Amino acid sequence: KEKKKINFLNPVSENPDGLGFKMNMNDIIATFACVAMEELDKSLRKRRIIGEIYREELKNLKKIKLLNYKKDRLPNYQIFPVHVVNRNKFAKFMWENNVQVNINNRRNDAYSIFGGLNKKLKNLNKVDKDVILLPIHLDLKKNDISRVIELVKKFDNL
């Protein structure tokens, strides 16, 4: 039996041939969101703590580079993107060690319906090849954060 190749970065790799997905919240999800607003400040604080720990611990690596945050701006740490050399190898390494990493906001021009890749978009071309998201969700415990950092550093030294 042929082993199926796993795409760690795009498990739903489709090439849509039409536009228009209705991705609105339904009333139940909207109610959950309204209730969650009461916890927003607490959630943002926890994400900021995790993000600052990552930034401190991962700031001087060779294969992983942090995004350049401007001094006059405060990130909300909704996601924690990093630039990484050999993103696919990094993703495979992290997934094999039971740490879920992924990519976010894939470029639309990757889909044929939008006309193909635009090589003039230099920054987009770069980040589409090397940016990956580290876990930064609210269920992370201190030992989870330490483990992510340990594995990122281990990959950096491979």
Can you annotate each of these PLM segments?
Residues 1-158:
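PLP-dependent aminotransferase class I/II
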